[in-house]
Design a protein with these regions (language model features):
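Helical element adjacent to the flavin cofactor pocket in flavoenzyme catalytic cores
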Residues: 1-50, 58
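Mid-domain beta-loop-alpha active-site segment that forms a flexible
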Residues: 1-13, 56-58, 123-130, 175, ...
């Protein structure tokens, strides 16, 4: 799955369904009164009977405003991208992924460095060396770009799906596998949110699993 094509398709579908997208609309506060959420943002006030927090690392700050916890942390990963080449990879791999256009995306690094998103030569060199040893033909291919980004990590690495008891209609969703889980989120989870309650299967991913005293 090409994540860029997937994101574009989901975004277009969102707009087709009369969704409204606001950029640079940082949220400052959320209140809940008589079944209605009031969200204060850089782009103004918004009210709705249902609220889904899917702000990635921002959920750590926002979730407590609706009575939930989202103990997420940033984990940096770096990626190298090769020139376009003929089809080489036809099996799933964690280190190497080939796009439909032919470029190979290389990388599975994990760095606990807070919110630092700078690229580092030593990590990129390690990634390139592992790729060369995994698939020797890559040694002669050019790297055309690279970048670093932050994963949204829970304490155990698995998703966190929660619904608020003190603010009914409020949900918090966190994962670092958005592309892999897109189908489940679009169909199963969306239906549960519309119904106002997570199914038993999703409830097992609640943040409460980290509360030893509650278990």
């Amino acid at each position: 799955v090409n994540p860029l094509y997937l994101l574009k398709s989901l975004y277009n579908c969102f707009l087709t369904c009369n969704g409204q997208s606001l950029h640079d609309a940082e949220v400052f506060d959320i209140t809940h009164d008589e079944g209605v959420f009031d969200v204060s943002s850089r782009k103004g006030q918004f009210q709705a009977p249902c609220l889904v927090l899917a702000a990635g690392l921002g959920n750590r700050k926002l979730a407590p405003l609706i009575g939930l916890k989202q103990p997420v942390r940033p984990q940096k990963g770096q990626i190298l991208v090769t020139q376009k080449i003929d089809k080489l990879i036809d099996v799933p791999m964690t280190l190497l992924r080939q796009t439909a256009e032919g470029s190979i995306m290389i990388g599975d690094s994990k760095e606990e460095v807070g919110f630092d998103i700078s690229s580092s030569i030593d990590i990129m060199a390690q990634i390139a060396d592992r790729a060369r040893r995994t698939l020797p033909v890559l040694e002669k291919q050019q790297i055309i770009r690279s970048w670093a980004a932050l994963r949204v990590m829970s304490p155990d690495g698995f998703p966190m799906y929660d619904q608020s008891e003190v603010c009914p209609g409020g949900f918090a969703i966190t994962c670092h596998s958005g592309v892999t889980l897109a189908a489940a989120h679009c169909f199963d989870m969306a239906a549960d949110i519309e119904a106002g309650n997570f199914s038993v299967g999703l409830q097992s991913f609640s943040e409460r699993r980290f509360d030893v005293s509650a278990n």
